[in-house]
Structure formats: structure tokens, C-alpha cells
């Protein structure tokens, strides 16, 4: 089941995120956030979804502000993470599809994904949803003894209008 995340989901989300932070360059964080910090992130995101098997969170995806300055408010940065045993199962596709549908319905115009490279699985996933590579920052992050590039992918969610639409608030709903 896919549903809106709540602050109470922070521990389940951290169970997925902590090993990614500790053991991979996928996230450029050097230390995992605390449960309280993760709960605050969930509360302030534009959209945050979790996918469960039974009552166990096996993945999450969120749309965060692309940048803090006001003119960027119609663009979101998308991130998706799955538990090791959920990868390759199609759950990531379902989760990303729901997230993109939700932010599009709310009025966002662009979605961006920053991907630490190399990461062929993430690149294939985002490109299969119509994201196109628009930039690459070389040697932008140093983690685990090596320099890493970040590629940026973009998908237009709707045609831009002038003036742009208002962004509708996040609504707590249970999805597919």
C-alpha cells in the first residue's frame, strides 16, 4: 500500500536511509539524521509517500523544494529510496508514479532528480518516466574516499503558464 507519510513514520524511513548514508555515496549526507530530524523533514516536504508490505515500510519517495528562493516554488526535487529487499520488485516504479501524479495534480511545473553517479538503476528509473539529463556537476562531493559526480534530470510536469497556477496544499490521502 502507498500512503502519505506521517511524522510517526520517521523510524521506518530511517531504517532504509541509515545504511545508504553510512555505506554508499547515493546520499551526500555524512551522518544519518536522528529520528526527530527525519520527522521534521517529513513534516516540511511538499509531498512524502511511503510504500508498505503489511505494516512494514519498504520504501519512500518525496518531493522537496528545489531551491528556497520564491521563484523556484513551482519546481520540486524528487528522491526515492527502497529497502534492499524491495529493490527490483517494481515497487519503486509504483511509488515514483504516485508521487509524480500527486505533485502534478497540485500544480507543480517541473520535477528534478539529482543522482550521484554512477547509478545506472536510478538513471534508468527516472528516464523511464520521461526525465531528461540536463546537467552534470563533476567531482562535486567527496565521500567514502572518492570524489563523486551528480547528474541532474528534469521532467516537465505541465506546460508553464503565465502567471503560474497556485500550488494546492498537501492532502492526507491513502493511495494505490
Specify the residue positions occupied by each region the protein language model found.
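A short beta-loop-alpha structural element at the N-terminal edge
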Residues: 1-13
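Conserved GNAT-fold acetyl-CoA-binding loop/helix
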Residues: 14-40
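Acetyl-CoA-dependent GNAT
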Residues: 30-85, 96-97, 102, 156-158
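Glycine-rich acetyl-CoA-binding "A-motif" of GNAT/NAT acetyltransferases
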Residues: 56-60, 121, 147
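Conserved catalytic-core motifs of GNAT/GCN5-like acyltransferases
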Residues: 62, 112-115, 127, 132-149, ...
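Conserved acetyl-CoA-binding loop-helix of GNAT-fold acetyltransferases
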Residues: 88-101, 121-128
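Conserved GNAT acetyl-CoA-binding A-motif
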Residues: 103-115
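Acidic/histidine-enriched, glycine/proline-rich intrinsically disordered or flexible terminal extensions
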Residues: 158-176
